[in-house]
């Protein structure tokens, strides 16, 4: 098989995983703003935490790869996630909150992440496709600032 066919098949498989995962999530909410530093992450964390405290199975995806701050806000910056051949398992905060953040994957939490557009989008796609969110009532997404500005 040619390399381009392999990439195409891989892309189709990724799309199928993303679709399959998203179908298990009743409501997807992206907290967005056209400007940085306005409290987007704070709103996302508080919304996810409140929904989980009310008994809703909730996921929080910190897709801001340049400055993942949700782990610090939740006090779980030292918590570990499990990643194996079956995918990535988000950190759980009992009783109903699951969290995935780029912050879990960085060895140096203060080091800047400098990625170009396609790599950034690939990371976000992987967070949705490879993370085992399970059945959720809500997935709260704190997106990249660039994605927020695209929608404003």
Residue ranges of model-derived segments:
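Phosphate-binding loop that captures ATP/GTP phosphates
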Residues: 57-59, 63-109, 114, 121, ...
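Short gly/ser/thr-rich secondary-structure transition/capping motifs
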Residues: 9-15, 81-84, 121-124, 144
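Walker A/P-loop phosphate-binding motif and the immediately C-terminal alpha-helix
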Residues: 28-65
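Phosphate-binding/switch loop-helix module in NTP-utilizing enzymes
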Residues: 106-152
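Short glycine/serine/threonine-rich phosphate/pyrophosphate-binding segments
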Residues: 38-46, 68-71, 143-151
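Generic secondary-structure signature for well-ordered alpha-helical cores
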Residues: 30, 53, 75, 125, ...
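Extreme N-terminal, non-catalytic leader segments
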Residues: 1-38, 79
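Short loop/turn elements that form and flank the Walker-type P-loop nucleotide-binding site
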Residues: 24-26, 54, 93-95, 133-136
């Amino acid at each position: 098989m040619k390399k381009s066919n392999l990439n195409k098949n891989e892309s189709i498989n990724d799309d199928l995983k993303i679709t399959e995962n998203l179908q298990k999530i009743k409501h997807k909410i992206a907290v967005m703003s056209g400007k940085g530093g306005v409290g987007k992450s704070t709103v996302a964390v508080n919304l996810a935490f409140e929904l989980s405290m009310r008994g809703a199975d909730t996921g929080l995806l910190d897709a801001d790869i340049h400055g993942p701050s949700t782990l610090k806000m939740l006090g779980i910056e030292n918590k570990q996630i499990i990643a194996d051949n079956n995918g990535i398992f988000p950190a759980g905060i009992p009783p109903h909150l699951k969290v995935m953040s780029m912050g879990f994957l960085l060895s140096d939490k203060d080091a800047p992440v400098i990625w170009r557009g396609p790599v950034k989008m690939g990371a976000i796609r992987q967070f949705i496709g490879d993370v085992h969110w399970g059945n959720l009532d809500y997935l709260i997404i704190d997106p990249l600032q660039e994605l927020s500005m695209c929608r404003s």
